[in-house]
């Protein structure tokens, strides 16, 4: 895959011709030409080469060159800040300066009775020659229309410039022929005939057409420049210099000279130059430029930092981990540009029309002129109709309808931390009917947290937390880490634990201040005779809520329960509610047990739950759900990669620095489910904008061309002046681009407004559950009782180990009952099952 810069394209017909020319090169697999960015992406292999591709473009009448890969960001900024609008403005001003006196002399005295200079008052030939000179000057100033139009016509691919140049040249040549008639009459002394011919001059039309088209081109160029504002603002954020430490001294060098492994420092108020890892220091970093997150993120040793983010209040020393084109900022820019360079499926309609549009318009103009001549109208009248058809038609509006909306939409998404990898992803995301969400890390925070501290009689919360943190301080279990982390956050001091012992399948034991402390599951406390009915009931209630209750006892007496769970993110419920308001069904897909999954579903409002699914089986569930509508799968992009790939749209959430996730079509920089709804809303608004643009482009041409040809003359005697046709054409592209710019007003946190779509119809039982139910009726089952399981992580580990056995159809693990129920499609020996449990680190009691 290689990118090329293309020069000489002015409209959709040009890009279509370039695309056809490159497709004709042997070895070219795929080619996409972007009129908006004047670029081309080509996927090719031998015998095709970059030189052959450039030669094919050159033979088609355009220019092409491989994009320079060195100093890429600087080149991109230069290309985005094109001085094309300034060049067009100079031409426009010069044309207008000449057009005003031309219009005064040609039409002012006829329409408004304005006085003429004495030299013109009685000499029609002087008026004609004056118009000839001014019009010729305007045509020279705007010679690019004639050069481009003629070149395209000679290559058999007429474009918009061909239409403009033909219309203007026809008026100019006809007027010059009339001027010769005037000269002949004047030489023969027939001033009256010469004065009569004066009304047949169309020089002002030729000049006005070129000037008005230039007005439209200027407005279009300015508007197109604004479509890349989001990318340019990101580039502006990148610092130009970095302060690195080399040979023990601080040195300020250009940011692009920082290499991987360099140590750099960032002072308060400075932007971080490259991606890195904090070595020392601490600060709050504003990452809103990359993620759209307005709240600064705390950084400490070991934390990752990204280029173009702002260090607010601390001194950071960091090690460079990703530099140059590998930084998060560069990947974001690359992603947005790739999206703009690809074509949305909806653009194929405009592409097909653009390929035949200009020849069709030329044919219509010829037929219209001939028809009026045959009907008996004067040649000047017929010529005016043909010229009107040529100059009112606008292939540019068709060609720009989709890409400008894609460019603005993808840029706006990037500004808010939503990255669409392709134009197709931006179009298809809005058509989502079912959103499937992973639980851990997507709906929940992804790491266990203490949710409840419930001391027994005679103890308070702080003393219970102190005991638990002291006891768990030497444990490596994730649940222990949650307790010690909570103690640190609460500034609770801990005591030294002596003789720490892990009790597999039950908990831990240690000596604290010379007395025995134990902590773990209910079975451990019960075995010591310390579990009363109230504490048991309290623990069961916590378990029903999807939490893991941990019981603690000290010196032979129970001290309380601390519940730990992977808590639901604060915005998950609101995000699910918004998705429902948009007419989207929500499904949770998780490998966790059903009790925990249902608890999370209840908290968030999820429609359907599919639990106890192994990572490898998630793709199968997604495939079955696709029967009921378009599916978007939301996950972390790594463990869920097969499911993301299987879905119609794969959405990777919380990607952070890993923008280039291969499995995802859409990358969300933040770990916020709310951004899923924002991505769908942005896609829908972009698609609606494309529909509006295409409607305007087709409506304008379908209505404008017949009127220009004279369709209203028989019934209403309304004829369109060529100058009005040129004015309409000059505004059509501007209207399309301006409409696309409205997407800049998109707000990701704005609640959905409008009529909801009909939710996708899903069966009451999800496909996998249905299969399990049917299988249970016919398949063989075995139950293995297990010691050692303490939390949902343990059950997931056991489920994975047993699910991997040959002949095991499904596995249901119960933490409460300390057992696993296996559904088999063939006989599996008990010894094989117990061996798998033992290898997973747990103790099988019996198998039946």
Regions found by a protein language model. Give the residues of each.
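Membrane-embedded alpha-helical bundles of multi-pass transporters
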Residues: 111-126, 154, 173, 412, ...
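Juxtamembrane coupling segments of multi-pass membrane pumps/enzymes
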Residues: 76, 182, 191-194, 207-268, ...
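Conserved cytosolic catalytic loops of P-type ATPases
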Residues: 26-45, 50, 55, 200-203, ...
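Hydrophobic alpha-helical transmembrane segments
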Residues: 136-145, 152, 169, 205-234, ...
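Conserved ATP-binding TGD loop and adjacent catalytic N/P-domain core of P-type ATPases
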Residues: 16, 432, 512-514, 538, ...
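ATP-driven catalytic headpiece of P-type ATPases
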Residues: 90, 309, 430-476, 506-587, ...
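Flexible metal-binding regulatory segments at protein termini and peripheral loops
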Residues: 1-126, 249-250, 334-342, 747-848
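Transmembrane helix-loop-helix hairpins at the membrane interface
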Residues: 87-241, 352, 717-722
């Amino acid at each position: 895959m290689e990118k090329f810069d293309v020069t000489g394209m002015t409209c959709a017909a040009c890009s279509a011709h370039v695309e056809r020319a490159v497709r004709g090169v042997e070895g070219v697999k795929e080619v996409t030409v972007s009129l908006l960015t004047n670029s081309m992406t080509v996927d090719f292999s031998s015998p095709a080469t970059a030189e052959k591709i450039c030669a094919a473009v050159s033979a088609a009448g355009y220019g092409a060159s491989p994009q320079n890969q060195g100093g890429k960001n600087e080149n991109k900024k230069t290309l985005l800040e094109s001085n094309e609008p300034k060049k067009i403005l100079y031409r426009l001003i010069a044309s207008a300066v000449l057009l005003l006196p031309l219009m005064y002399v040609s039409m002012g005295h006829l329409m408004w009775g304005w006085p003429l200079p004495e030299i013109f008052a009685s000499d029609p030939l002087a008026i004609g020659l004056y118009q000839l000179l001014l019009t010729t000057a305007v045509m020279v100033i705007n010679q690019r229309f004639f050069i481009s139009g003629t070149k395209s016509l000679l290559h058999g691919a007429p474009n918009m410039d061909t239409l403009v140049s033909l219309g203007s040249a026809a008026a100019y040549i006809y007027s010059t022929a009339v001027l010769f008639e005037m000269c002949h009459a004047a030489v023969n002394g027939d001033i009256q005939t010469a004065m009569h011919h004066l009304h047949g001059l169309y020089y002002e039309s030729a000049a006005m057409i070129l000037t008005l088209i230039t007005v439209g081109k200027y407005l279009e160029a300015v508007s197109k420049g604004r479509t890349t504002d989001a990318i340019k603002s990101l580039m502006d954020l990148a610092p130009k210099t970095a302060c690195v430490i080399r040979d023990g001294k601080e040195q300020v060098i250009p940011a692009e000279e920082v290499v991987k492994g360099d140590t750099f420092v960032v002072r308060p108020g400075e932007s971080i130059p490259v991606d890195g890892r904090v070595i020392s220091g601490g600060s709050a970093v504003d990452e809103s430029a990359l993620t759209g997150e307005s709240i600064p993120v705390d950084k400490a040793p070991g934390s990752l930092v990204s280029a173009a983010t702002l260090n607010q209040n601390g001194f950071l020393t960091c090690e460079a981990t990703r530099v140059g084109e590998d930084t998060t900022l560069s990947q974001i820019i690359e992603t947005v540009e790739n999206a703009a360079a690809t074509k949305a499926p909806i653009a194929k309609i405009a592409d097909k029309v653009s390929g035949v549009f200009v020849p069709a318009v030329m044919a219509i103009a010829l037929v219209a002129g001939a028809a009026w001549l045959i009907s008996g109208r004067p040649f000047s009248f017929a010529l005016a109709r043909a010229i009107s058809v040529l100059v009112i038609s606008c292939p540019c509006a068709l060609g720009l309808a989709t890409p400008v909306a894609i460019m603005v939409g993808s840029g706006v998404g990037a500004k808010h931390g939503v990255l669409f990898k392709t134009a197709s992803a931006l179009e298809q995301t809005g058509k989502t009917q079912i959103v499937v969400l992973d639980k851990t890390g997507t709906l929940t925070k992804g790491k266990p947290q203490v949710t409840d501290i419930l001391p027994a009689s005679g103890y308070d919360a702080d003393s219970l937390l102190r005991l638990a943190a002291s006891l768990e301080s030497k444990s490596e279990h994730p649940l222990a880490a949650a307790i010690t982390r909570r103690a640190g956050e609460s500034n609770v001091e801990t005591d030294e634990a002596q003789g720490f012992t892990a009790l597999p399948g039950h908990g831990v034991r240690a000596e604290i201040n010379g007395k025995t402390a134990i902590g773990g599951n209910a079975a451990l406390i019960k075995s010591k005779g310390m579990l009363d009915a109230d504490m048991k009931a309290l623990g069961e209630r916590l378990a029903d809520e999807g939490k893991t209750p941990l019981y603690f006892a000290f010196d032979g007496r129970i001290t309380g329960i601390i519940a730990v769970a992977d808590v639901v993110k604060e915005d998950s419920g609101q995000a699910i509610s918004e998705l429902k308001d948009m007419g989207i069904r929500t499904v949770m897909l998780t490998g966790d047990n059903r009790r925990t999954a249902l608890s999370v579903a209840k908290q968030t409002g999820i429609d359907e739950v599919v639990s106890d699914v192994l990572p490898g089986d998630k793709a199968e569930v997604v495939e079955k759900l696709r029967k009921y509508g378009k599916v978007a799968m939301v996950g972390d992009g790594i463990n869920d990669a097969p499911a993301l790939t299987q879905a119609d749209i794969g959405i990777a959430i919380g990607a952070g620095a890993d923008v280039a996730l291969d499995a995802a079509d859409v990358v969300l920089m933040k770990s916020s489910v709310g951004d899923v709804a924002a991505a769908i809303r942005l896609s829908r608004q972009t698609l609606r904008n494309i529909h509006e643009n295409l409607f305007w482009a087709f409506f304008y041409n379908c209505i404008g061309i017949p009127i220009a040809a004279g369709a209203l003359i028989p019934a209403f005697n309304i004829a369109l002046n060529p100058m009005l046709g040129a004015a309409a054409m000059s505004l059509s592209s501007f209207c399309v681009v301006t409409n696309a710019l409205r997407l800049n007003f998109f707000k990701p946190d704005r609640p959905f407004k409008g009529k909801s779509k009909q939710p996708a119809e899903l069966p009451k039982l999800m496909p996998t559950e249905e299969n399990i139910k049917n299988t249970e009726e016919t398949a063989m089952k075995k139950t293995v009782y297990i010691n050692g399981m303490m939390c949902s992580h343990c059950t997931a580990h056991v489920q994975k180990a047993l699910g991997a056995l040959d002949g095991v159809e499904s596995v249901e693990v119960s933490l409460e009952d300390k057992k696993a129920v296996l559904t088999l499609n063939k006989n599996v020996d008990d010894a094989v099952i117990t061996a798998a449990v033992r290898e997973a680190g747990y103790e099988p009691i019996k198998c039946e």
